[in-house]
Amino acid sequence: MNKRKNIYFLLLLALSLANIVAQYISGSSIQSRLFNSDALYLPTLFADILSNNGQINEWFLTPAPYFFPDYPMFLLAYLAGPTPYSQIIAFALIQTALTFFAIWLIARVTINVNSFITASTALVILIWLALSAREPFALILNSAHHYGAFLSSILLLALWIKFNNEGQIQRKIIFLFLIAIIAYATALSDNFFLLQFVAPLIATQAFISMAERDFAFKNKIPLIILAICSLLGSISYKWVVENQTRYPTNIGIDKLSSNLKDIYELLQSATIGNPLFGFIFLLYVGIVLYSLTKIIRGEKESAKLYWLAIFSFLSLCATLGAVSLVTNLSIESRYLIPALSWPVIVVLIFLSYRLRDRFFYLAIAISLLTLASMSCSSHHSIISNGINKQYYPEEISCIDNALEKENLHNGIAQYWDAKYFQNFSRLNLNIAQHSDNLGEIHWITSKKYFKQAYDFAIISENAAPPDKISSEALTRINGSPKFVETCGRKLVFMYGKDKMRVRKIVAVGDSYTWKACELPTRIGEKTADCGIKKKDGTQSGYLTFGPYDQLHTGQYTFEIAYSSAASKGKTAGDWDVVLALPKEAKVLNNGLITGTEGATEKIVGIFALDSGQDLEKIEIRTLARPNVDLTVICLRIDRVQ
């Protein structure tokens, strides 16, 4: 009988997975979430390394590099699918299937009743929530969005419970070794793991120890080993990752009220916006309170179930508490994955244990209702959009045709377009990420994509600064493009093979002139002819600085055109040429700015960059002295060697 029931739920599970595929290939709203630039991190990385001879040490990885479990899962997806389009859906199915396995395992080690039915029902609900395009539930389909750390947490929790209830010493050692390895790999991959798993596990064990009056040190050794391995994993990031992008997390109460408001809105959207999940969440709160009283009273029956409820609640509290105190990051739904996913798992495991055989009828009713809802949405999406076995929008086709005609392959685009076009083009394109002022964006990309010269630029007409690449900046450096192709909302500026520069000065003989009003200022204001003059003659400070352009090793000359009403020979200010280094500027040359009696004159100087200073940012500063008139007109830099 149980085998037949499991077959029913296996069928329901398969139909739920089929709905994921149906909505994906019919272009539903989940597709846009899977195709944004952040979500295309692993497809781009794996294609570069496995197909284009790329090296991982050339990459600027995500701040949480997601080595485990995301990399092994995506490797399977990469081997299973010939294109990024098929690899993305393959990954979604693999991650969803592993979530089922993890839930099944934790149900088996806690209650060992209806484990398959419980895991199937939980996953059907989670898939339904995901396909309703509600975050963070939709992230079960995404790679590299913190879901992998949550998946590891479920698996590790099941192994931890199994370890604590294992009688054989050899098996306990094997389980502890496996736990330590997974904890190390996950902490190396995502610091969020420490918050959602390690901290609440320590707190749960401490609470249980106090409730049971168990203060023996030897019983704490496995927990200490797990904590040490997790911390070592987190610390190892600085030795493992070549180009580090992990940023510090600032904690304080400065944004507490706004953070709490954002968290409240996310919770309200998840619960009030979805009555079924809202009801599950209310049941979850009741289960946590019930479990808390049972543990305090020292009841041993169902202890593992109560322990699971307390752990999940402490994980929820740790997540929400820490996120509410962060001052340098915005509140994103992906930070609430454990807080909103654990209630579904815990409630179904608890109901399965309490209802026993009757749980089958509740589970099949819930599964059929949610499956019917998913199937209706999938049918509507297929009727509206059709089925696309390949993803090749007209906009990308238009761009490909234009580039293929001119035999162009190396180009630039804004951050949100670069990986998208590179992945879904039928051409072997190399597209580097650049900002509006043509600066390189070293964020989730490879160093090898950036070139001294390119062939084309893709400009999004509907993008806003600082994302939209400036056509004016391109034409000032390179002149008018050879061809311009309009493809939907994109403009393709085609200059020809290696005919387009983004750096103003690259080769010997290159020069560039900045009007003073294009440079930053502290005490100046713009003049009618785009110069910069002092707002207040009594002030002193930087009249102009910048331009922060990266220059290659070589020798350069510069000219600062300026005027001052001060008499000749009188000092009106100071100038210097510096490397804009992260901690402090390094002065390469400096001198005085003298009066010109109102005439326009030039300061001419030289500077050189050695091999250790290649591509450092250069800044040429003018510092006005008090009670002296000074106007900067323009700045010119020439590469002479």
What is each of the regions a protein language model found here?
Residues 405-439, 565:
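Short periplasmic/luminal acceptor-recognition loop of GT-C membrane glycosyltransferases, typified by
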Residues 38-48, 60-83, 258-268:
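Short hydrophobic/aromatic helix or loop-helix immediately within or flanking a transmembrane segment
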Residues 202-213, 277-302:
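Hydrophobic, aromatic-rich transmembrane alpha-helices
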Residues 5-16, 173-179, 224-228, 283, ...:
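Signature aromatic-anchored transmembrane alpha helix within multi-pass, membrane-resident enzymes
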Residues 144-152, 195, 275-286, 304-356:
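Hydrophobic/aromatic-rich transmembrane helices and adjacent perimembrane loops
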